Swiss-Prot record:
GO terms for molecular function: N-acetyl-gamma-aminoadipyl-phosphate reductase activity; N-acetyl-gamma-glutamyl-phosphate reductase activity; NAD binding; NADP+ binding. It comes from Haloarcula marismortui (strain ATCC 43049 / DSM 3752 / JCM 8966 / VKM B-1809) (Halobacterium marismortui). This is Putative [LysW]-L-2-aminoadipate/[LysW]-L-glutamate phosphate reductase. Its EC number is 1.2.1.103, 1.2.1.106. Belongs to the NAGSA dehydrogenase family. Type 1 subfamily. LysY sub-subfamily. GO terms for cellular component: cytoplasm. Signal peptide: none annotated. It catalyses: [amino-group carrier protein]-C-terminal-N-(1-carboxy-5-oxopentan-1-yl)-L-glutamine + phosphate + NADP(+) = [amino-group carrier protein]-C-terminal-N-(1-carboxy-5-phosphooxy-5-oxopentan-1-yl)-L-glutamine + NADPH + H(+); [amino-group carrier protein]-C-terminal-gamma-(L-glutamyl-5-semialdehyde)-L-glutamate + phosphate + NADP(+) = [amino-group carrier protein]-C-terminal-gamma-(5-phospho-L-glutamyl)-L-glutamate + NADPH + H(+).
Length: 345
């Protein structure tokens, strides 16, 4: 069976990744892409890798009826347009933060409130490794934040294996590429200002903390740095377990959680150049790399995870979740394994 799909907000970076994935997906027919600023231009005008397509951007006011609508719009748009989205499609996958959290109180604390709070309990978080069963048949799906996704994937096995209880001190440092700022950018995203930086841009209070709290049930000390790469999110989690932990315990926890997951790979101190997770290794793919190292002298466990922020942290996660929701093979349209060697991701 072939499902029709549309992308609302298709001219941005994440929208472009959605268009790329859907264009090559064996079970989706890309029916529409909207952009207010690029209306009537071909999608290749914004995304040169899609110049082969004749599809043109249409107005977001003229939504066509499709099976699945992917919304790659700024925060606040989807909650205002959700009625139109759901009228146009049986399944809506939102890539903004509008439906990620479970309660109105959380949006009051972390964002600027929510205009459609009754829909929050109907939404399902899009990370299949965390929420697969609830995604099956879901009609409103919220793709997770890239920094939260990297952190959750790194820490989840430790909680599932009861290595951590939630009372431990956990310090998370995330380094992200410039594409996280979107195609619109701003002064801080211009090449002269961004090139060569290791810039703390959210030392405390990053909104993705709310997702980590919600799904792992913990508070973390969370800091995000902007670094000189285009794609990628790399999370380094410093954990101080209350109990003694061995390498065997860790291998058992991570293999037990991820051995059957098609998009998560364990990379933990092996040979070669790429001994631990790196964004460069997963650029352009829906894969996540997860690894760890023990520091027994300081009673510390260091957990690493790396994803492409626009793929596993956004568009790839969204398509993966849609596959699960519709009963499509999970890896469909997401088989690309990346390139090596490559330049800065």
């Amino acid at each position: 069976m072939t499902y029709t799909a549309s992308v609302v907000g298709g001219s941005g970076f994440t929208g472009g990744e959605l268009l790329r994935l859907l264009d090559g997906h064996p079970e989706f027919e890309l029916a529409q892409a909207t952009s207010r600023s690029k209306e009537n231009k071909t999608i290749g005008h914004s995304h040169p890798n899609l110049r082969h397509s004749d599809l043109r951007f249409s107005s977001p006011e003229d939504l066509e009826s499709v099976d699945v609508l992917f919304a790659a719009t700024p925060h606040g748009v989807s909650m205002e347009q959700i009625d139109a989205f759901q009228e146009a499609a049986g399944t809506v996958v939102d890539l903004s933060a509008d439906f990620r959290l479970e309660s109105e109180a959380q949006y009051d604390e972390w964002y600027d409130g929510h205009t459609r709070p009754k829909l929050l309990e109907q939404s399902e978080y899009a990370l299949p490794e965390l929420n697969r069963d609830n995604l099956e048949g879901a009609d409103l799906i919220a793709s997770g934040g890239c920094n939260a996704t990297a952190t959750i994937l790194g820490l989840l096995p430790l909680f599932e294996a009861d290595i951590l209880s939630g009372d431990e001190q956990i310090v998370v440092d995330v380094k992200v590429g410039s594409s996280e700022g979107g195609a619109g950018g701003g002064e801080a995203s211009s090449h002269p200002e961004r090139s060569g930086v290791v810039r703390p841009y959210a030392p405390t209070g990053h909104r993705h903390e709310a997702e980590i709290q919600q799904f792992l049930g913990i508070d973390v000390s969370f800091t995000v740095h902007a670094v000189d790469m285009i794609r990628g999110a790399s999370a380094t989690c410093h954990v101080f377990p209350e109990q003694r932990v061995s390498k065997g315990d860790l291998w058992g926890a991570y293999r037990g959680e991820y051995e059957d997951e098609p998009f998560v790979e364990l990379v933990a101190g092996g040979g070669g150049v790429y001994r631990y997770p790196e964004p460069k290794s997963v650029a352009g793919t829906n894969r996540a790399e997860v690894g760890f190292e023990l520091d027994p002298g300081n009673k510390r466990l260091v957990v690493f995870s790396a994803i492409d922020n626009m793929m596993k942290g956004s568009a790839g996660q969204a398509v993966h979740a849609a596959n699960v929701a519709l009963g499509i093979e999970e890896t469909a349209g997401l088989e690309f394994q990346g390139l090596h060697p490559v330049g800065a991701p």
